[in-house]
Amino acid sequence: MAPPNGTANDVTTTNGSYTNIVGRKTTMHKLIEEHGSILMPGVQDALSAAVVEKTGFHAAFASGYSVSAAMLGLPDFGLLTTTEVVEATRRITAAAPNLCIIVDGDTGGGGPLNVQRFIRELISAGAKGVFLEDQVWPKKCGHMRGKAVVPAEEHALKIAAAREAIGDSDFFLVARTDARAPHGLEEGIRRANMYREAGADATFVEAPADIGELKEVSSKTKGLRIANMIEGGKTPLHTPEEFKELGFHLIAHSLTAVYATARALVNIMKILKEKGTTRDDLDQMATFSEFNELISLESWYEAESKFKSFTPKAES
């Protein structure tokens, strides 16, 4: 498939295939090359990852906002630790082994050496990539107010450190900048290109305000580009086909799953509280058999059947 509009020459070969900044193809590069643009739902835990995989998606995003909500019941306010992120990643990748899992790494856990340790732990946990952002710690969700960013050169060093830690691993490095809100779009674009030069496989200018800003990001940034669709957020919602035409390659729906889960739980709990039973509202839930299929219950019965009895060999 030919590269979509806006792809920079420095990430394509002469036949239109994708490589990373050091000339290797990661799983994510191959997916983008095959499909042109990749729709990547957010996941918050092992169950949501299993749903995404069984629905037929190729990739998923372990969103910090979503993981913080599911694991801690807390907002995306810099409260989630890197240790907790790695723990959540292990569970997510185990539940969805065929998904390309990209992890929200927030600011990377400290300085360049902390970033390197974090990257190695994510690789060990089965992740296929990470987003690293340039916010001041403690960070906030990219669509919340009150954000600040570190000097661009400071984050570029983290990206360079991450690139070194990745080595030959199948791991996709995304550099995110939140500079649009505090300093304007031009600064966000400048930073994205600097982070690309430092070693990022793709760049992500968070929270463009409209189609005009999306077009400007596409025309002025190099390499592969990420867009983030937040229902109720600052960037208007667009389809993957529309983003492909705009020159974006990876489209994250970071919070769709956690928002849908929250709404469904609130609704059914209200029903249970008001009625004292769910007898007349079973259509609001998965059935017993549907859920067992979702969590692959039968495969566990099959595994269990191998160990029903043991017969020792007769002595000669």
Predicted regions, residues:
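Extended, intrinsically disordered, low-complexity segments
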Residues: 3-22, 256-316
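Alpha/beta enzyme core
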Residues: 17-253, 259-263, 267-270, 306-316
